[in-house]
Curated annotation (Swiss-Prot):
This is A-type ATP synthase subunit E. One of its GO terms (molecular function) is proton-transporting ATP synthase activity, rotational mechanism. Has multiple subunits with at least A(3), B(3), C, D, E, F, H, I and proteolipid K(x). GO terms for biological process: proton motive force-driven plasma membrane ATP synthesis. Gene3D superfamilies: ATP synthase, E subunit, C-terminal, F1F0 ATP synthase subunit B, membrane domain. The gene is atpE. It is a peripheral membrane protein. It is found in: Cell membrane. Keywords: ATP synthesis, Cell membrane, Hydrogen ion transport, Ion transport, Membrane, Transport. Coiled coil: none annotated.
Amino acid sequence: MSSGTNKIVESIKSEAQEKADKIIQDAQAEIATINSDAEKTAEAEKNKILDNGKKQSDMKYQQIISEAKMNARRAELGAKEEVIEAAFAKATEDLKAKASSDDAEYSESLIKMIEEATEELGGGDLIVQVKESDVAKVEGHLKKLSADLATKTGVSTTLVLGEPIDAIGGAILKTRNGDIEVNNTIESRLDRFKGLLRSEVANVLFKN
């Protein structure tokens, strides 16, 4: 190979080497950039995952705490309800015992319940129903009650005993034709006032 040819070949090889070096250099720079970007992306993703994980963990924690509080509240309300129901059951038993005796206070209350029911009906010809053991407590009062209630209501009033009823105590009054009735038994009164009484009983039982 001539000297001129060698120079050309060497020049081509040198130029090719420079291009190769440049390509390699550029490639290495690109790889470094890719690696750097990948690391940043990976770090961001890692932080995102950790952040999401923390959020999910916090949410789960709050959910568990909320459920625990709700269950505790439910259990507390359930326990209070049991205590209140037990208090009502005890009160009912006490009333039953009082109404089954010759207790003067109950006899007075029974007459009062008949008066209230008569006034609610507006007087008139009414049938009075009480339990069998209470018949003797009221039959001697009906004539005077009729006169007193006629004055109160402004309507001619006659109270007569009807068939005995099955009740703890109290009375049921109704018109002669049975169209209108006022249930003033102890059971009915307890049911009517239970909502109000429940609140008062709860305040007394759980005031602390």
